[in-house]
Amino acid sequence: LSSIIEYRSAETGRHVQRIRMFTRVLLEDLARTCPEYGLDEARIQVISSAAAMHDIGKVAIPDAILNKPGPLTPAEYERMKDHTIKGCEMLAALEKATDRDYLHCAYNICRSHHERWNGAGYPDGLRGDAIPLEAQAVGVADCYDALTTDRVYKQAIPPGEAFQMILNGECGQFSPRLLESFKQVRGQFAALARRYADDAQAGAVSYTHLR
């Protein structure tokens, strides 16, 4: 299922693969520094695998919005935000799947990876640890990838600039603990971005908004 969106969107490329790897290294550091989260290797594997499903709901978004080479109108942006709910509806249809833990994790990620620590995200306006941890981690990974890769509506920005933007809250607020782990794995994120770069990835310097 996670590969379907790569055929619909001109901006995805190896995005799904990077998100899985970013999520893994972020959670590995969090497991080391915050054992209270109970993040053993098995749990990290489930979360990083389920991270591949985070944008599956974009298959329900019209191509004209998904691949628009410019800023979205307010109405288009509201429609784009529906990908979180549409993805959950798709995953709910798989309720008889044998791996229920994976499916539950994927559902949480799909629905809540655009939530933010201060309640300013969507679709539910969750705040703090009411946001599932797996969705919090994928939110950081997704934001970094959106900033550092070319999209149809923007050019990539350098990794160092993206790093500072996330820490400064310019892309919404994230968990302070996750941001501490993000600092620790900054080099790994940059290395993974290079290793799994999209073909013909450019390193330009501007962006408009994240979708």
Enumerate the language-model features and the residues they cover.
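Metal-dependent catalytic cores of enzymes that make or break cyclic nucleotides
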Residues: E6-L210
